[in-house]
Structures are given as C-alpha cells and as structure tokens.
Amino acid sequence: MSEAIFLTFPDGSVRSFPAGATGRDVAESISKSLAKSAVAIAIDGTVQDLSDTVADGKIEIITRKDGRALELIRHDAAHVMAEAVQELWPGTQVTIGPVIENGFYYDFAKNEPFTPDDLPKIEKKMKEIIARNAPFTKQIWSREKAKEVFAAKGENYKVELVDAIPAGQDLKIYNQGDWFDLCRGPHMASTGQVGTAFKLMKVAGAYWRGDSNNAMLSRIYGTAWADQADLDNYLHMLAEAEKRDHRKLGREMDLFHFQEEGPGVVFWHGKGWRIFQALVSYMRRRLAVDYEEVNAPQVLDTALWETSGHWGWYQENMFAVKSAHAMTHPEDKEADNRVFALKPMNCPGHVQIFKHGLKSYRELPIRLAEFGLVHRYEPSGALHGLMRVRGFTQDDAHIFCTDEQMAAECLKINDLILSVYEDFGFKEIVVKLSTRPEKRVGSDALWDRAEAVMTDVLKTIEAQSEGRIKTGILPGEGAFYGPKFEYTLKDAIGREWQCGTTQVDFNLPERFGAFYIDSNSEKTQPVMIHRAICGSMERFLGILIENFAGHLPLWVSPLQVVVATITSEADAYGLEVAEALREAGLNVETDFRNEKINYKVREHSVTKVPVIIVCGRKEAEERTVNIRRLGSQDQVSMGLDAAVDSLALEATPPDVRRKAEAKKARAA
C-alpha cells in the first residue's frame, strides 16, 4: 500500500494524506468548523460517506449549503421515518424508501394502513430520533448473515431484497443507534444532521414492486429541506399550486372536462377550445415564413412503425387497431387484416413526406411543421388533467438539412423558442445539452460531430443571452438516436417545466433510406432535427392556466370582456359598447340581468373574465365606460372610443403587434 495519497482540492491545490485517511480526517485537517459542518465528501464527483477512506483524486467537502446535501438530507430523513414507524408500531415491516423530487417516501407492510392522523405522531418521534444525534455507521455483511438477521426480525421484504442483489456485490448495512437498514448509501454523519426542516405530507397505498399482483403496502410521503425557510417556501408553493390547479380552474372557467369513457382525452368546451385555437393560431403565424405546414395520417400500418423502430422500442406505449369487420368476419378473404397503430409521434410521417420526390441540396433546409394529434398509452394512475394525457397535439417540426447547416438551424430554432416563451411571459429559461447515452445508434464519429456542433451552439446561446439564459450539460441523457437540447421554463411560483426540445436524429433517415442529391450528384443522408416548442399543446395550455392562475393575458383569454349594466336604462348603451368592442375584434358577452352590479362582478371574477365594463345611467349620458380589471380594486373611467382602442391593442397578439409596429416604423 502506498505511504500517502494525493488529493486535489477545488482551488487546484494538492495535498498529501496518509493511506487510510477518511473524509472526516481531511475535513478536520482544514478546520474544525468545516469538519463540524461537513455532511459528506465527493471523490471525483462521486458522493461518499465522511467515514470512507479516501483515494487519490479530486475531493470536495460537502456541507448543508451544497445542493448535493439535499438528497442526503432526504435520504436520511426516510431512514429516520422508518425507525420512528417501527418504534411506534412494532412488527411493521420496512420495504424501500427512496428519495424523489422534492422529498422522499417509504413503503411499509402494516396490518392496518396509516391514516393522516398518524403523521403528527410520526413527526414527533422523528424529532426525538434526530435529537439523539445517533451516528450513521456502515457495515458490510455477507448475504447469509443479512438473510438470517432480517428473517429473524420478520423482515420478509428485506430478505427478498437481499436475494435480488447480484452475487459478488457488497451488502451494506447502515446503523443509526440500535436501528439498522439495508442501504447502498451514502449517508450523513448522524441523525442530527437531518435537521427539523421536514414535514410528512400524505399517506397512500402502493403495491410491492409496483405490481398489482403483489401485496398492497402503506406509503408515507415526506419532504425535507436544508433549512426552515426553504421548507416554508416549498409549502407556500404547494398551497399556491393547489389554488392554481388547472383542473380546478378548468371547471370554474368552463374550459374542459374528462370522463371515464375517454380516459386521458380532453372534452374541450367552447371557451377552452377558443384558448386552444388562439394558441395554435399564434404558433401557426410564427411558423408561416420558414416552415411548410403538413399533415401526416393518424393511423398507419404497423409495418411502418417496425421500420421506424417504434414498434420494437415503444410498442407498450402505442394503441393498435384493426378493422371491426376483419375481426368479426375472419372468413372474408377480401378483408384488410392488417394491424394499424395510432401514431405516437409525427416524425415517421414527415420522413415519408420528405422522401416523396427527389430532393436536391439546393432545396435544403426543408422544414416541415405539423400540429399533429398523437396518442400514447399512459397508465390510468398516471393521468393528470391536461399535463398527462393519452391523446394530445404536438407542435412538431422536422428540419432536413445538410451537416453544414445544422448549427445555423439549431440557433434559428433557439431564437424561435425563446421568442415564443417571452411572448407568454416566461423570462427564466434553462437550456441543457443531453449527450450520448451508453446504448445508442450511429458511429462515434457522428456523435462527436453532432455534440461538437451543439456544444458550440450552446456557448453561442449563452453568449447572446448576456446571462439571461442559463445553460448546462446532461451527460448520458441524450436519446439513443442523437443528442438534444432541452428547454425548461420557470413559472410564476418557481416550478420548472421542461417544454421545448431540439433533437438531432441519426436513426430515422437511415432506417427509411431518406436522401438528397448533393453537389457531387451523390445520394447523401440528410441531418434530421426534431423540434418542439410547446411540446404538448394541451400541457402547455395547462401550464399557462396555472402560471397565470387562470388570469390569462387578454389576447389568449377565451372571453375577453363582459359588459354589465347597473340599470336597465343603460342596456341600450351597453349593447352599443359591446358591438363596438366586437367590431374591434374582441370576444364580448353582455350581462343585463336584474342583479346588483357587485354580484355580477364577483360572479365573472370567479370565471376569470379579465375585463368587466360597467355601464350605468351616468356612463350612457357621458358616453364613457367604467373599466374593472380582474384582481384589481381600481376602477378606470374612459371615453368609449379610447377604451375600445386601448382594449383592442391589448387584445392583439404580441407577434401581430410587432409586425404592425415594424410596418409603421418603415413607413415613418
């Protein structure tokens, strides 16, 4: 064994330590305060226990301020919760307890399932365990010992987990005082480092290993954060998210509904369909100059999906259909017995359109766009309003270009995506490049070239944004058929939504034999770029509803203005106001009911009407209007003509407004 090991620190300095030194030893050599605040170490990027011996490499000391500490806090909180449950209900079996987004859960085998009333008791016991500050210590057990000990404790699920661990792999046991669990780790130094910024959120049922043929377990979800302020912010965000839930607002605003006969497909009501069409119309205008809109069939022979690879890679997520006649009349030799599939993606259809007719390099790039209805199977339990459906519309486009055109096309797509997001009020955008996964098609040379181009594009995006756009790399997260950019936007309450993608595809052009004639009169395979901006139009609409809490921008709102009268004497003038607004292009309804004006205003506010114009005897005499805005107590009095002009301008989509302003500037 070497007499010394050499560690490189984040500042570039290199120090030697005796062989056998642990992460804690390294932290203590720097300062006692660092050793006290340290929760783990990272060697060459891999997070490890503080008690682990270190080897040559790059070392980082992880404290609670480090983003990586959050996963450790949540992981340890799950273990503390499991110990608390077994102290409160002896005989309960623990199964698995992973970290998930924003928290953790643990599944338990218990005779009687947990109820929400149990959660405060468990939280109290967890705080007791945390206060004990018991150290986390790691042991390596043999398979035989682990099975024997867990079997003796009646932990049958743990025995099954031990059996599932591959032979030759270490079996790690982590102790926290007298309690222990089978776990890969890593963990922090002690239960005390979990802190008290946690909350148990809910109970649920879950099948063992997610299989409905297995036993039903009792699951407890929790969340944990580095400090109380972060926990409070998260809980506030959840409360806001509940108020903004698009399913609730969709009912209140009479936009859409779902029902059992069509699980995961939307029944659009008139107002909801208006929003959807406004979104499609806007996107269609943005594509009018550079793209050719096409439409590929929704139902295609599975032979095509076999060629594309979807039938092999994606079959479980597809809907297959066969004619009822062929199924009920097998004796009919003329019947079409083929199996067809509803398209889950638009790309194979677009390749067929590209292939139809010889293409020259002079015609490239060819950009094909479609608002294509696609269908993908999702388990019933995964369906979630507009956010997770089985039938949805993709704002899909596919660009066929030369290798040399790839960078320019990616930048052009980026400009369009960012401009669209900005028009909808999204300012905080993150663009990340996902690179080659282990399992992939295409040669290393192809990947090298594509990743080099996209890395340069990412640098250009960052430079052009002057810091407004954050960028990053997701190693190994690319699709099997090519690297991609992922666009994530942040909404009004801080949630992140991954929407846009720019995806290079080495697979489909080769599978379908797509080519163009290059400058040497040779057949050459084009570069194919998949592009989506909203992604699922339904999901994007759901994001908009939640981002604006139903108070959509006037140009997207399905009902833009309600004209309400105070007295029947103003009804004739109210009709005149409504007609003037309609002539200016606004969606308007009138409310001349014999109800008090405050009642009318409250009622229309619930349905999120953005503008209510109130007309009484005074307004009729003076030919003015009283404007009330959703969410504001202010009342603005304006002349009718000025009000119509102002609201018409506000209701003009931003892209149309820009064109008008540019035309005006040219004429000046």
UniProtKB/Swiss-Prot annotation:
Listed PROSITE patterns: AA_TRNA_LIGASE_II, TGS
Co-factor binding comment: Binds 1 zinc ion per subunit.
Single GO biological process annotation from the record: threonyl-tRNA aminoacylation
Keywords annotated in UniProt: Aminoacyl-tRNA synthetase, ATP-binding, Cytoplasm, Ligase, Metal-binding, Nucleotide-binding, Protein biosynthesis, RNA-binding, tRNA-binding, Zinc
Pfam families: HGTP_anticodon (PF03129), TGS (PF02824), tRNA-synt_2b (PF00587), tRNA_SAD (PF07973)
TGS domain sequence ranges: 1-64
An annotated GO cellular component: cytosol
Start and end residues of each stretch annotated as Catalytic: 245-553
Enzyme Commission (EC) number: 6.1.1.3
Source organism, top-level taxon: Bacteria
Catalyzed reactions: tRNA(Thr) + L-threonine + ATP = L-threonyl-tRNA(Thr) + AMP + diphosphate + H(+)
GO molecular function: ATP binding; metal ion binding; threonine-tRNA ligase activity; tRNA binding
UniProt binding sites for Zn(2+): C347, H398, H530
SMART domains with a match to the protein in the record: tRNA_SAD
First-listed, main subcellular location of the protein, grouped into a coarse class: cytoplasm
Cofactor(s) essential for the protein: Zn(2+)
Keyword Hydrolase assigned: no
InterPro entries in the cross-refs: aa-tRNA-synt_IIb, aa-tRNA-synth_II, aa-tRNA-synth_II/BPL/LPL, Anticodon-bd, Anticodon-bd_dom_sf, Beta-grasp_dom_sf, TGS, TGS-like
EC class of the enzyme, as a word: ligase
Subunit-level organization: Homodimer.
Family assignment from sequence similarity: Belongs to the class-II aminoacyl-tRNA synthetase family.
NCBIfam families documented for this protein: thrS (TIGR00418)
Role description: Catalyzes the attachment of threonine to tRNA(Thr) in a two-step reaction: L-threonine is first activated by ATP to form Thr-AMP and then transferred to the acceptor end of tRNA(Thr). Also edits incorrectly charged L-seryl-tRNA(Thr).
Name under which the protein is recorded: Threonine--tRNA ligase
Organism annotation: Rhizobium leguminosarum bv. trifolii (strain WSM2304)
Gene behind the chain: thrS
